[in-house]
């Protein structure tokens, strides 16, 4: 929210929003997922948001790829949905970030890269931070094992996949692991801790927000001034 507000967006957090429905779909409860989608559809329309912005790769994938079918009986979701990296890619040139002399590695969430095709977009956001050294792991797009309900229903397998991912990331010797999904962030933090690593796991937008907070002075309002975003993610975002 801080980054979007700094860029001039009016950010509205919709507490009444339902879950995107991804866990329900994974469990096979399509009827409940459809009800959640219709609730969100009505809410977005009633609040007159300009776009929905989400910082969760799974939510973004669900809105973009699953909602057209889930909303077949009630009409389309008539508001653009963007992952936060898509918005950041537009905003980076005007954000006051200074120079960050830091070595980081990137973990690509399955639902961001393979699901939404935004792997290059996300990495371009990181690379546009002056001074940052982005070191790729041997398998940057390998699953972390979180998998939403998989972590609950198949905990041992989820941990085993996470441990393998942690080993790969530790091979970069980067003190910071950056990812674009809260679920991946939680899984990687626990996996790295079990492996004895002191690496910190951050969401991309956290790094941007930290840099803005550290840099004194402002360039004024950005190109998003006056737009509304909804959060779960919106313009109202």
Tell me what each language-model feature is.
Residues 1-237:
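Iron-sulfur cluster-binding electron-transfer modules in prokaryotic oxidoreductases
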């Amino acid at each position: 929210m801080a980054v979007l507000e700094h860029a001039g967006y009016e950010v509205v957090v919709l507490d009444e929003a339902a879950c995107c429905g991804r866990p329900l779909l994974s469990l096979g409860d399509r009827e409940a997922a459809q009800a959640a989608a219709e609730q969100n559809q009505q809410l977005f329309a009633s609040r007159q948001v300009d776009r929905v912005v989400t910082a969760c790769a799974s939510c973004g994938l669900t809105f973009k790829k699953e909602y057209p079918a889930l909303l077949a009986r009630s009409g389309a979701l008539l508001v653009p949905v963007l992952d936060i990296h898509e918005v950041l890619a537009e905003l980076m040139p005007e954000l006051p970030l200074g120079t960050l002399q830091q070595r980081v590695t990137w973990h690509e969430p399955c639902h961001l890269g393979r699901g939404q095709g935004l792997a290059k977009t996300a990495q371009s956001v990181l690379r546009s931070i002056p001074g940052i050294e982005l070191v790729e792991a041997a398998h940057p797009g390998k699953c972390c094992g979180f998998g939403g309900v998989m972590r609950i229903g198949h905990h041992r397998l989820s941990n085993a996949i996470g441990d393998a991912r942690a080993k790969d990331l530790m091979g970069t010797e980067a003190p910071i692991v950056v990812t674009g999904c809260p679920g991946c962030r939680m899984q990687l933090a626990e996996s790295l801790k079990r492996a004895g690593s002191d690496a910190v796991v951050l969401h991309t937008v956290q790094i941007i927000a930290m840099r803005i907070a550290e840099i004194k002075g402002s360039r004024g309002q950005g190109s998003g001034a006056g737009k509304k975003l909804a959060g779960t993610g919106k313009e109202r975002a």
